[in-house]
Amino acid sequence: MPVTVDEIRALAASLPRSYEAHVRGLVKFRVGQIVFLSIAPDGSRMGCGFPKEFRQAAVDAEPEKFALPSASDMRFNWIHVSLAAIDADEMRDLVEGAWSMVVPKFLAEQYAHEQGYARD
């Protein structure tokens, strides 16, 4: 079942140090001044932090789900995701993964442990 913008916003807002900002009609989530998530005005897709070294493989493997960012944004760790093509678990993985790229490592590890993701 596709995810909704409200589900994405709720998860992103719940992450430590995350806050919502509005820039040129886009809903963005930041930690400090670093954007880790952006939602298209029409709610059809999101852009999120994603490791550059895995980006092309993700697009090649699932082109209905992932798309490369614009040429000017290729220098960033970023990918576009079709919301109609992902479920709640995939959305959670993508949003939490993007967030974990921009927070201090200790905070990402603490969050993972609290969520039951980390090994003891």
Q: Predicted segment positions?
A:
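Charge-dense, helix-prone N-terminal extensions
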Residues: 1-120
